[in-house]
């Protein structure tokens, strides 16, 4: 009798454990399937990367000039906004981004002194070129806004205002800046909506890239040629102190064999 009861208990226990064993097998099966799926996804990702690398090797991008390389050909600045005399001996070309904090720092700390000492005295031509960085979402439209203000003779006024209000240059803010500058609002908005300066800004970016520029602010300094183009002799990258600009500019303003400016 005892053996019979023991056998019945064993059977009952096995009957109770069977669903658990089945569930464990199902769980293991699910885990195995997930592992296989994950492995397949990984293999697909690796395969895609290999395919991308193969395409890149087949069509390599054009090599960009080294960061310290200077443009071999003079740069045309005939259609760019500038300050100072058009026929100045020396030109400074700024490639900048209205949303860039380093550009804002340069505009606050160095730019005013350069304007006072070299532009207002007629010694240099100061040229602006756009280089809105792709990770600054407001930079492109801000650049277009400055050129739209330029149609009403206030490019530099908008330039100054955008840098003074870098935290408020989203698309919705631009009409407010136009109003503060007393621009014709409808003309400004029509210009901004048209996007007609986007192509010119893209050309500025291309020129910067060909000159080995990849960040802002960057500056090309050189001598103005008879046709108005600029033969670059110096490159400065970053919000450099005034002294570095002064050194580069004074060397070009000094006569051959002469000393620096007093």
Regions found by a protein language model. Name each.
Residues 98-179, 184, 251:
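Structural alpha/beta surface segment adjacent to cysteine/selenocysteine redox centers
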């Amino acid at each position: 009798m005892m053996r019979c009861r023991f056998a019945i208990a064993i059977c009952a226990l096995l009957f109770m454990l069977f669903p658990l064993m089945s569930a464990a097998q199902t769980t293991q099966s699910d885990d195995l399937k997930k592992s296989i799926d994950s492995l397949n996804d990984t293999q697909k990702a690796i395969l895609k990367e290999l395919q991308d690398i193969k395409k890149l090797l087949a069509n390599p991008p054009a090599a960009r000039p080294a960061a310290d390389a200077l443009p071999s050909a003079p740069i045309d600045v005939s259609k760019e906004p500038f300050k100072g005399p058009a026929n100045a001996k020396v030109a400074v070309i700024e490639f900048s981004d209205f949303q860039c904090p380093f550009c804002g720092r340069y505009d606050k700390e160095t730019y005013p002194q350069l304007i006072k000492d070299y532009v207002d005295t007629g010694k240099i031509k100061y040229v602006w070129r756009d280089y809105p960085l792709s990770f600054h979402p407001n930079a492109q439209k801000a650049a277009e806004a400055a050129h739209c203000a330029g149609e009403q003779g206030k490019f530099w006024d908008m330039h100054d205002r955008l840098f003074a209000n870098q935290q408020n240059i989203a698309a919705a803010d631009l009409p407010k800046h136009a109003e503060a500058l007393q621009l014709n609002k409808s003309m400004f908005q029509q210009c901004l909506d048209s996007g007609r300066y986007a192509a010119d800004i893209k050309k500025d970016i291309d020129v910067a890239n060909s000159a080995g520029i990849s960040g802002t602010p960057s500056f090309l300094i050189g001598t103005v040629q008879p046709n108005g183009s600029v033969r670059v002799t110096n490159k400065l990258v970053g919000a450099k102190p005034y002294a570095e600009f002064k050194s580069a500019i004074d060397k070009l303003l000094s006569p051959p064999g002469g000393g620096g400016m007093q």
